[in-house]
Amino acid sequence: MQKNSDASLKKLIEEHELNCFTKSKKFILDNPLALSIDDLSRLAEMANGLQESTAAYYTDPKTVQTLCQQLPKIHKRTLRILEPSVGVGNILRQVIHYYKGLFDSIECDVFDINQHSLEICEIFIQKEFSDFNNLKINYIYDDFLTHQLEKKYDLVVGNPPFMKIKGVYRENLRQEFKNPIADNISAFFLDKSIGLSNYVVLIMPKYFLHNSDFSMSREKIKNTNIQCITDFGETLFKGVLIETICLFLDTKSENISGTKVISVPKKIELIQDQSEITQSFFPNWLIYINESFKKLASEMNFGIFNVFRDRQITSKILEPTGDIWVIKSKNIPRSGDKIIHIEDDVFIEKSALSKLGVNKYLKRDDVFLSPNMTYYPRVVVKPKNCVVNGSVAIFELKPDISITETDLLFFASPEFEAFYRIARNHSTRSLNIDNIAIFYFGKRNHCVQ
């Protein structure tokens, strides 16, 4: 385990000029302060100058142990592992430890586009497994997604980057993996991995469960055996506020015993029906779906609103006084029955507003407002002669649908709040009300006008 704080390691990096790779590599090789492997690994990640551009972040060893507890049981004499984005090997080393005594030999192909990371990974492997003669690792300095692979593996395991990509590179990958809507590079890592191995264990952004650009990747794996989904929440990466999950897939067999769902933040473990998680009625996967959710869903009419959100209104163009009131999420109390003025109300001049998309709603009072980033949903009628900033979404009823005050108050009820948390998979970060989330703001069938 890591024994030194990040602050202490940062001080070491500065004192020993470890942002220089040559010095960093020598420091790790010599280990003059007798640091633990985990400390050295964290230090190497912190000193990685390419971390942001390659979306490579430190995977906490404690979290990797949680991952390893769900690794598949594989019955062979030689285990063949592929790590598509190995970094300095934090996951790889613990996976090898897990399987070390269970096979005659272990063979690994490991990829990374950062040659320095591969060199450090090799040092750590040599330090930690010097007594393991039947371990063979092939270090490949190349892009896993474009590298031609002929062989098959028993296990693909890793933590791919999560960044969005564009341009020719993205279009080539979309064509190669028959996924014309994917924007996030992790989708292509998953698409390629499931064609290479019996078992796939990949860490993914939690918004994989929700976002529309992952919908084709979700479709590709919904009929594999999803043995387990571990929800790490925000615990996986130190210093990076992103929620993650880990998918454990058996690509060759059917799921007959259910999908294990583990929530690290909530400390719960469930066995869910895979077909209910991956159902097609709702626009996203639902890993925490339960009887209460299904009961309320059976009473509701969904997809009644379209949503609009404008992020063009920034603090630069707002004033403490002015022509037009700009409603923020703070102006909509938890009670969900009114809009209130607050001490730090803000306003915008007509001339500035006229250039923005939200201006079209200025005179309207037939649309509705909802705070955007919250677990406490509420929906209120928009007054005339005001607009909203990006913290508030505007709901517009679809044609031939009406709504009552009782329907609106339902959105602020504890019953709908619990329902909505499950709809959002208990996320804490990805809570924007987008074209997926708006689906769940429905109303009970007996209230439909």
Q: Which residues are covered by each model-predicted region?
A:
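Short, compositionally biased
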Residues: 381-392
